[in-house]
C-alpha cells in the first residue's frame, strides 16, 4: 500500500502511574513510576448518574478521549472515532458467566448493557453529542496495529481527522492465569491526514508483506510490564517514536498477522 502520512494533533492518557500525556511522556523519558491509589478516572464529560454506573474500561476510554480532543483543538462532535480493547471487560464477562452458570440466571440489566464491546464508544458519543461514525475493534495482542491501520485508512479516505482510543483494564481474578494484565491503561490520539494538518506531517504508516515484531520495552520496570501484558499498551512504542520529534527518521514495526506487519516511520522535518 502507498504510505499514509499523518500528524498527531492531541494525546490523552491515563494509567496506573500517570493521569495525562505530559506525565506519561516523563515516564517514557526515564522518570520513575509512582503507582496510583485511585481506583480509576472520573471523566467529567459523562453525566454524574451515568458515570456512577460506568465500568472501569469505559471510564478509562472516555477520560483519555476527552483529554485528546481538548488538546487537539477539534470539537468532539466532529470526530469519527475508533475504540479498541484487546481484552474487553473481563470483570463483566466473569460476572455474566457465573450468573448464567448458576440457578438464578437473572442478569443485572445495567451490567448486561455495559457488557457489549462498543460500550465505551456508546458512552463517548452520547456524552459528547457525536453523530459521526464510531467503531469498536478487538484484536488481542495485535489490537494496536490493526486499529491504527483501520483508523488511518479511514482518515485518509475521508480526508478528516479521527479519534483513536486504546484501553484495557486489569483482568478479572479468574482469568489472570490466561490474561495476565494487572494494570489499567488508556491512550487516545487525534490523528490528522497530511493534507489537513496545520503543520508538516511527522509520521507515516505502510503495510509490509513480511512478519513484524514488537519493539523492545526500555522504560521503567512498571511501564515495561504494562507494555508486555496489556495488549493496548503496545501503543507505547508509537508514542516513544512520536516523542523523539521530527529531527530523526527512525521507524518501528508492529505485527499485523503471521505474514504482514505495519511500519510506522518518523518523517524528517
Summary of predicted features, one role per range:
Residues 1-117, 121-133, 166-269:
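Conserved "HGTGT" condensation-loop signature of ketosynthase/thiolase-family condensing enzymes
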Residues 61-66, 71, 136-161:
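Active-site-proximal alpha-helical scaffold in enzymes
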Amino acid at each position: 500500500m502507498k504510505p499514509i502520512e499523518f500528524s498527531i494533533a492531541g494525546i490523552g492518557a491515563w494509567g496506573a502511574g500517570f493521569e495525562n500525556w505530559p506525565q506519561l511522556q516523563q515516564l517514557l523519558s526515564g522518570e520513575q513510576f509512582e503507582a496510583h491509589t485511585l481506583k480509576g478516572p472520573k471523566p467529567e464529560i459523562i453525566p454524574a448518574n451515568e458515570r456512577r454506573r460506568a465500568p472501569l474500561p469505559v471510564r478509562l476510554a472516555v477520560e483519555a478521549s476527552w483529554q485528546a480532543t481538548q488538546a487537539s483543538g477539534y470539537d468532539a462532535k466532529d470526530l469519527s472515532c475508533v475504540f479498541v480493547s484487546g481484552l474487553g471487560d473481563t470483570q463483566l464477562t466473569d460476572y455474566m458467566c457465573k450468573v448464567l452458570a448458576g440457578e438464578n440466571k437473572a442478569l443485572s440489566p445495567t451490567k448486561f448493557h455495559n457488557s457489549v464491546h462498543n460500550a465505551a464508544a456508546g458512552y463517548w458519543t452520547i456524552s459528547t453529542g457525536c453523530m459521526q461514525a464510531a467503531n469498536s475493534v478487538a484484536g488481542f495482542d495485535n489490537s494496536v496495529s490493526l486499529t491504527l491501520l483501520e483508523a488511518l485508512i479511514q482518515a485518509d479516505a475521508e480526508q478528516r481527522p479521527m479519534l483513536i482510543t486504546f484501553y484495557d483494564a486489569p483482568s478479572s481474578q479468574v482469568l489472570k492465569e490466561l490474561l495476565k494484565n494487572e494494570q489499567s491503561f488508556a491512550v487516545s490520539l487525534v490523528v490528522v491526514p497530511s493534507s489537513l494538518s496545520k503543520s508538516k506531517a511527522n509520521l507515516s504508516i505502510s503495510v509490509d508483506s513480511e512478519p513484524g515484531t514488537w519493539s523492545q520495552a526500555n522504560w521503567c520496570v512498571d511501564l515495561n510490564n504494562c507494555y508486555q501484558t496489556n495488549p493496548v499498551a503496545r501503543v507505547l512504542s508509537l508514542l516513544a517514536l512520536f516523542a523523539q520529534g521530527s529531527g530523526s527518521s527512525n521507524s518501528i514495526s508492529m505485527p499485523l498477522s503471521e505474514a504482514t506487519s505495519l511500519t510506522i516511520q518518523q518523517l524528517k522535518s
